[in-house]
């Protein structure tokens, strides 16, 4: 069973909490913070924390949320073995797994409503890497 890690900064706290509540009954999921919306925090701290956990085991995946999803994506992608994808549609959430073997999805609370974000997360979690011609490309990342 895959382990899911989830984290956010203050700007992504509400969406992170919503996603966590929706997933906790069905998945082994760990919330790595932040735990307060009212206190401003630095998103790289949470992206690095989650990336370290996800990179420990191939089956681990992560969900990162900030205001736009961009900062979390950039910070997470600095880590070896992390392929973080900023997702804003169901199609690109699926393709991030299918073609790019993404192991972290990043979302922007200010840009993505809860319903679409949840659909993206479900697509991400329920899509496997296709391999084949994409394997060589992913190895080149």
Outline where the language-model segments fall.
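Short, structured active-site "lid" loops
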Residues: 46-64, 68
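Short helix-loop-beta junction
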Residues: 21-29, 81
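Short active-site oxyanion
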Residues: 3-4, 59-62, 81-83
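A short beta-strand-loop structural module common to alpha/beta enzyme folds
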Residues: 28-40
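Glycine-rich phosphate/diphosphate-binding loop of Rossmann-like nucleotide-binding domains
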Residues: 6-24
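Mid-chain, well-packed structural core segment of small domains
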Residues: 64-106, 110
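C-terminal binding/interaction regions
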Residues: 5-7, 11-12, 90-141
């Amino acid at each position: 069973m895959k382990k899911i890690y989830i984290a956010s900064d203050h700007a992504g706290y509400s969406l992170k909490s919503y996603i966590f509540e929706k997933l906790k009954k069905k998945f082994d999921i760990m919330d790595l913070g932040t735990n307060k919306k009212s206190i401003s925090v630095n998103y790289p701290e949470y992206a690095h924390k989650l990336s370290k956990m996800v990179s420990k085991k191939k089956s681990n995946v992560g969900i990162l949320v900030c205001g736009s999803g961009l900062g979390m994506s950039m910070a997470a992608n600095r880590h070896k073995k992390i392929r973080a994808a900023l997702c804003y549609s169901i199609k690109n959430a699926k393709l991030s797994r299918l073609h790019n073997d993404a192991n972290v999805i990043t979302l922007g609370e200010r840009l993505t409503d809860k319903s679409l974000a949840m659909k993206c997360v479900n697509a991400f979690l329920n899509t496997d890497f296709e391999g084949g011609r994409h394997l060589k490309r992913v190895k080149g990342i």
